[in-house]
Design a protein with these regions (language model features):
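Short hydrophobic/aromatic beta-strand micro-patches
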Residues: 2-4
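Vicinal oxygen chelate
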Residues: 10-51
Length: 51
């Protein structure tokens, strides 16, 4: 899932019943994080590195 601000998305995961599987890390020109939603679905979150 492409997002504009990965930090904001990750900060909202746990308070809303989800889990951070992998904290944000740099992958080429992207920031990537893996999260699990409250239903157990694993999702990749991506943000383009702008600088």
């Amino acid at each position: 899932i492409y997002v504009d601000r990965i930090e904001e998305v990750v900060e909202r995961v746990v308070p809303n019943g989800g889990e951070i599987v992998k904290a944000p890390y740099r992958e080429g020109n992207l920031w990537v994080s893996i999260i699990r939603d409250p239903a157990g679905n694993v999702l990749g979150v991506w943000q383009e590195n702008k600088g």
